[in-house]
Amino acid sequence: MPKKSFQRTERISVQIRRDLGAFVQAAVRDHGLPSMSVSDVEVTRDMAHAKVFVTVLQAERSFEAVAGLKALARELRMQLAQTMRLRFVPELHFHYDDSLDRGERINTLLRDLIPPADAEKDESG
C-alpha cells in the first residue's frame, strides 16, 4: 500500500513541474524576473507542501529570482489549482537549485588538474 502513495506523489511532482514550468515562464515575461526554469519538484507524502527547485540563467540573480517567485507563490498556486484535478494543491516553497553551479565548479577543478600538454599525450598515445 505505501508504494502506491509514493507513486502518486511522484506523478503529482511531475505534473506540478510541467505545469509550473509554463507558469514560471509567463511570470518571467510579465514581472521582469530573471530567466529561469523549474528543475525539480518534491512533494511531501501528505501532499501539503511542495519544494520547487529552480535554475537561474544568471546565477548572480538567483536571490532576486527566488524572492520574486516567493512573492508570486499564491498566484502560481491558484493557477495550478485551475489546471490540476486535485482536492488540495500543495503549498509551494521555492529554492534555488545550485547543482549546475556545483557541476561547473567540479568541471573547472578537473580541467585544472590535468595540464593541456598531458591531456594531448593521453589522447594521441
Swiss-Prot record:
Gene3D superfamilies membership: 3.30.300.20
Would I find Transcription among this entry's keywords? Answer: no
Which keywords appear in this protein's UniProt record, sorted alphabetically? Cytoplasm, Ribosome biogenesis
The molecular function terms in GO held by this entry are: ribosomal small subunit binding
Any signal peptide, and if so, which residues? none
Compartments reported by the entry: Cytoplasm
- Note the superkingdom of the native organism: Bacteria
- Record's Gene Ontology CC terms? cytosol
The alphabetized list of GO BP terms reads: maturation of SSU-rRNA
Q: Which InterPro entries did the record assign?
A: KH_dom-like_a/b, RbfA, RbfA_dom_sf, Ribosome-bd_factorA_CS
Q: Name one Pfam family in it.
A: RBFA
Keyword Cytoplasm (UniProt): yes
What's the main place this protein lives? cytoplasm
Q: What does the similarity note say?
A: Belongs to the RbfA family.
- Please give the HAMAP family that the UniProt record associates with this protein: RbfA
Q: What does this protein do?
A: One of several proteins that assist in the late maturation steps of the functional core of the 30S ribosomal subunit. Associates with free 30S ribosomal subunits (but not with 30S subunits that are part of 70S ribosomes or polysomes). Required for efficient processing of 16S rRNA. May interact with the 5'-terminal helix region of 16S rRNA.
Q: How does it assemble?
A: Monomer. Binds 30S ribosomal subunits, but not 50S ribosomal subunits or 70S ribosomes.
Query: What is the name of the protein in this document?
Result: Ribosome-binding factor A
